Amino acid sequence: MVNSKGKITDSDPGSSHLLLNGLADKAGKNQDTEPENSLCSQYEEKVRPCIDLIDSLRALGVEQDLALPAIAVIGDQSSGKSSVLEALSGVALPRGSGIVTRCPLVLKLKKLLNKDEWRGKVSYQDFEMEISDPSEVEVEINKAQNAIAGEGQGISHELISLEVSSPHVPDLTLIDLPGITRVAVGNQPADIGHQTKKLIKKYILKQETINLVVVPCNVDIATTEALSMAEEVDPDGDRTIGILTKPDLVDRGTESKVVDVAQNLVCHLKKGYMIVKCRGQQDIQDQVTLTEALQKERDFFEDHPHFRVLLEEGRATVPCLADRLTSELITHICKTLPLLENQIKENYEKITEELQKYGSDVPEEEHEKMFFLIEKINAFNHDITSLTEGEEFVGEDECRLFTKIRNEFHKWSLVIEKRFQRGYKAICKQIERFENRYRGRELPGFVNYKTFEIIIKQQIKELEEPAVYMLHTITDMVQAAFTDISEANFAEFFNLYRTTKSKIEDIKFELEKEAEKSIRLHFQMEQIVYCQDQVYQCALQRVREESDKGKDRKINSMCSKEVSSVNISLSDIFEHLLAYRQEATNRISSHIPLIIQYFILQVYGQKLQKDMLLLLHDKDTHNWLLKERSDTSDKRKLLKERLARLAQARRRLAKFPG
């Protein structure tokens, strides 16, 4: 309703007509006087723009992206739903047995504030037709339903738009939905009941939709399927209005029960109930006009001993219903506009970001295609450079490729340390075994170099396969990263992506072999036991100092028994092994990662970039390389259409006086 300050509220469903149609009617009757002109201006400024805004957004197709404020009309078959819509719109809609409304019908009613002639328009799919006579509406709606849903009793989710402009209709937009059916009859699909409920729920589930539930007065309201569906999606009744029809068919003695329902005392809805008496089948056969039917309706409620009170409360007659619905729709639109604006903004930003992934359209001109391909390849090469230099952009929960590789190198250093430190006691036994086998004429206390050399070579040799395994692991990581970059840049061009992926694999196999060859060569060189004299002497001195100070108790504790039973030279050999191991560890732990970085990052990236630039030389392949996936161009087109819709919607919302 509208309170004393002119604000629309939900508390009293009956008194809202004082602002809306009453406002418009007064403005239309006395357009020459200043007060009425003021009312007309208020009507034009407050009511019309709200509904026109939402209708324009719906016409743009914004409803494909997000929900718009709407009033959806639902009801069981034979509930009187069509009669209510006819009374509101002033035009005859399809009638008959079975499912009459087979497609959602957007009924846009526009009140003309002057004496302009009645006009209508039917729109669906790519078809649009102006209508000059109200009697043509029913035929055109039937044609539209047959074109969309086919001949027969099938239904469709596709919208039909009917626009009616007249001095005798309220400013209102309704969505008429198929009547609820339970059993398939005739040539209806076997699951017609499921189909209709699914279609209805698609609309009434949305929080932006006011559900207008049409219920006959002569049925038990508690068992009504339409009201049950509304309660399921709106359990608190916040956005549901009940419309009671056929009060003239109520059995004698049950009128008070109908009044209780209408006064919201039985099945409570926060927005309450309205009651109307529309044309019945006999009225139609008697050719009672809609205007005459409205007068008969008012006379019925004024003269009825039980229902008169509902008229006095503003809960009865079609004109009161029209005003109430317009009031509700305006309130609902104003309430949801801020949220709608935010949703449009968020969707616009999201689609813009998604569209960037698909890039721009491929040019038609050959020379432009060359520049387009150059840009694509340069962008790819730039990403490869960033990756190999450890400067690529990564998400919040991701890490750079170089970080992953560095972790593998750290694991490598731990492997070396673990292999060299493996079992001091076992090494002591190994020293003893080699000493017994290879000791020559040396006197006790002299180190046998052959023993030292064989042991150190064996320890280093054991690291060769782990090094090669690390190479393969890192190569696979780099290949996967390069492939991801290729997909990110070329996914929509399947030939270019496939060509790039093939090059990534070919270069990988080539350089992996070279890197493995270099690693194995390094380990072959490590079989030459060598270290600069000064470096080795310093390392040996450090080992002996640690041994003397008792810091390296492992030598003394683990080998004391072995030394006492064999020869003092075992301790000396162990010290030499530790000294040489330190220097060998430094060499191997650094040089193997250098080999991998050189071949698998630096050379791999450079060679791939050069091979990609070579693609530009063969102009005959440009069209083939830039051939898009059909779904890519379709998706880009769809995203652009959505973006254009939302951009227009944002502009219209920005201009709305609000």
From Swiss-Prot:
PROSITE patterns: G_DYNAMIN_1, G_DYNAMIN_2, GED
Gene3D superfamilies registered for this protein in UniProt: Dynamin, middle domain, P-loop containing nucleotide triphosphate hydrolases
Molecular function per GO: GTP binding; GTPase activity; microtubule binding
A single Gene Ontology CC term: microtubule
Spans annotated as Critical for lipid-binding: 551-554
SMART domains associated with the record: DYNc, GED
Keyword GTP-binding in annotation: yes
Entry binding sites for GTP: 75-82, 176-180, 245-248
Function: Interferon-induced dynamin-like GTPase with antiviral activity.
Cross-referenced PANTHER family: DYNAMIN, INTERFERON-INDUCED GTP-BINDING PROTEIN MX1
UniProt record similarity statement: Belongs to the TRAFAC class dynamin-like GTPase superfamily. Dynamin/Fzo/YdjA family.
Designated name of the protein: Interferon-induced GTP-binding protein Mx1
Species lineage: Eukaryota, Metazoa, Chordata, Craniata, Vertebrata
Gene: MX1
